[in-house]
């Protein structure tokens, strides 16, 4: 089960792709935390469509938890974020926290030996970028960013196909001006 597309609301726009699992069930377990932006639904859809197994979640807001359960069914919600960090099943934590908190959450995730998948923008200061860069180098963990307008946007994918097919000539530059 996954969230359906809501084209009228860019903040919760969560397209679904053709499912193309690249892992077996239970082979790649992930969790979701801090559902402050609707892109968490697109992030979750993408991970599920790739074959990932959603094993747990953390979200302080009762309403946001209910919205998530309405889309994905019953899921184990933990009462503290640290429980996700301590769970040995979890290989990656996806998050759409408030932007200025994203890097700090990612640093905690990587320090716990897990990869991190955050919504954009991933940083709000140069110091955050440097801290994450250093943590990636020392931990070996990944800090991935969900650019929905590139990864989950039919127009962007179609443009990519047109470019690949040579239908629009030689492309010198692409600029994406997102709605928010």
Predicted regions, residues:
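Residues embedded in well-ordered beta-strands within globular domains across many folds
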Residues: 58, 94, 172-175
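Short, well-ordered coil/turn segments that N-cap beta-strands
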Residues: 27, 52, 75, 91, ...
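Histidine-centered active-site/metal-ligand motif
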Residues: 37-39, 102, 115, 180
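N-terminal Rossmann-like dinucleotide-binding module
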Residues: 2-72
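Alpha-helical elements of Rossmann-like donor-binding domains used by nucleotide-donor carbohydrate transfer enzymes
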Residues: 42, 67, 83, 92, ...
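A contiguous active-site-proximal alpha/beta segment in oxidoreductase catalytic domains
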Residues: 123-180
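Beta-loop-alpha module in the N-terminal Rossmann-like domain of NAD(P)-dependent dehydrogenases
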Residues: 72-135
